[in-house]
């Protein structure tokens, strides 16, 4: 029950933060209050984009949540705790790299508007090389340091096999490359063209979870 209160507290805190931010922004920039009405076509287009963005985000939330739910339901909390220890290390490194994507999104969006398609394509190739290099270096470190660190941290009794570490590393690399393309997708607002992929990925991930959990 305490955990449920904790989750509700997170939700309430986020709502309060959003409301406070809106109030502060209105006071700091009163001259930017919207006036007039939008055309029906513009409203419909905005609704389509919001719906497609919502679908995209829901798909990625399901992907991240399905693993935890399936492991806890089929293998128990002990296996889930071991998995979460490994995933905690992985996600911590991913958060550091996420700073790069977050800081570049606005600049990428501006470049898509004001620069040529050739310039944006060249930038995408440079970003792809940079993220591939950073992710590759992290992947090599994971392969060599994951197990020794986990042995020092939790002991041999609470460790996964090396095969699981390889799976974590593959997941990490794919996620980082995918985040780059998602950054460009978010910056350019092309969620409609890609609206089904997150749902297909989420469904595939759930099916593979239910299938592979039987081989644990």
Can you annotate each of these PLM segments?
Residues 3-4, 78-81, 159-162, 191-192:
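Residues that define the loop-to-transmembrane-helix transition and helix capping
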Residues 3-10, 21-65, 69, 107-122:
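Interhelical loop/hinge segments that connect adjacent transmembrane helices in multipass membrane
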Residues 6-23, 56, 60-64, 87, ...:
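Short runs within selected transmembrane alpha-helices of multi-pass transporters and secretion channels
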């Amino acid at each position: 029950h305490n955990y449920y209160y904790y989750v509700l507290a997170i939700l309430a805190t986020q709502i309060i933060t959003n409301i406070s931010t809106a109030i502060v922004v209105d006071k700091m920039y009163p001259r930017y209050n919207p006036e007039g009405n939008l055309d029906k076509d513009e409203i419909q287009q905005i609704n389509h984009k919001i719906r497609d963005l919502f679908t995209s985000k829901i798909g990625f939330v399901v992907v991240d949540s399905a693993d935890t739910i399936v492991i806890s339901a089929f293998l128990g909390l002990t296996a889930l705790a071991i998995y979460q220890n490994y995933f905690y290390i992985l996600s911590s490194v991913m958060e550091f790299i996420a700073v790069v994507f977050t800081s570049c999104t606005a600049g990428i969006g501006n470049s898509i508007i004001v620069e040529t398609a050739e310039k944006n394509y060249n930038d995408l190739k440079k970003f792809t090389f940079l993220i591939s290099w950073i992710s590759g270096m992290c992947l090599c470190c994971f392969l060599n340091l994951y197990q020794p660190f986990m042995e020092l941290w939790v002991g041999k009794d609470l460790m996964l096999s090396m095969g699981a570490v390889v799976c974590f590393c593959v997941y990490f690399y794919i996620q980082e490359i995918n985040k780059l393309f998602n950054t460009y997708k978010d910056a350019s607002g092309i969620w409609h063209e890609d609206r089904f992929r997150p749902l297909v990925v989420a469904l595939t991930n759930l099916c593979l979870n239910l299938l592979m959990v039987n081989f644990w």
